[in-house]
Amino acid sequence: MIRKRTVIIVITILLLLAGILFYLQWGRQMDVSSSSGSGSDNHYELRVSVILNTLVVTDQQKCAEQIFEKCRDNSFHSVRFSYDIQIPHALSVTVYKNQKDAESGNSAFSFSYRQENQIDGTYNIVDNPEKFTLEMD
C-alpha cells in the first residue's frame, strides 16, 4: 500500500515538473523589450531587442525568421511599430532568452536582415522581404 502511494506521488511530481518545463519553454510568447530607429532621407534601420521567454534556443535561424515575420506583420504583443511614418529598409535584432538575461546584457544571439545595397532604400521589409538576406552575428 505504501509503495503504491509512493509511486503515485512520484508520478504526480514528475508530471507537474514536466508541465512547468513545458510552460517555461513553449507556453510564453516572445516580445519586444526595446526598439529604436535611425535613418536618413532614403534609408531607415530598425533596431529591436526581443525577449524569447524560453529556456533553450534550439534553432537560431528558424527563430530569426519568426522574429522577422513578427516585425513584418507588426504582431508583437506589447509594441506596435509605426510603419505609417516609415517602413524599415534594414532590421537589426538582439535576442535574449528571458528578462533576466536582457537586464544583464547576456544575449542569446543577434542577427540582421539587410539588402545587398545597404545605402539605397529601394526596398523595405514589409513590401519586399525576398530582397533581404539574413546575417547571423
Predicted regions and their residues:
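Mature extracytoplasmic domains of secretory-pathway proteins
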Residues: S49-F109
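Ser/Thr- (and often Asn-) enriched beta-sheet segments in non-cytosolic proteins
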Residues: D31-S33, S92-T94, T133
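Short amphipathic alpha-helical surface micro-motifs
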Residues: I13-L15, G27-S33, R72-S78
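Hydrophobic membrane-insertion alpha-helices, especially the h-region
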Residues: V7-Q25
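C-terminal partner/receptor-binding element of secreted or periplasmic proteins
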Residues: Y113-D137
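Short edge beta-strands and adjacent turn/loop segments
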Residues: W26-L52
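Positively charged n-region of N-terminal signal peptides that target proteins for export
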Residues: M1-R5
